[in-house]
Amino acid sequence: MASLIVMDRTGDTRHTFDIQDRAEVEKAERRFRDLTGAGFTAAVRSGPGEQRVIRSFDPTAEETLFYPRLVGG
């Protein structure tokens, strides 16, 4: 199972999907597009304590983390 982890002001929400199930992968890809379109940054782990920002959906990533755009003021 792969996970999309969405960080927001309420904490985090995890959405899991089976990479072998086409319908679930399509739903996860739509969620990826919706979140990145709303300004979230998507990243995958690239090593211990490291992450890499991604711009397109990778269904083979074990975990994709989404975090909101930082706003200063």
Per-region residue spans from a language model:
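Ubiquitin-like/PB1-type beta-grasp interaction modules and other compact soluble beta-rich domains
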Residues: M1-G72
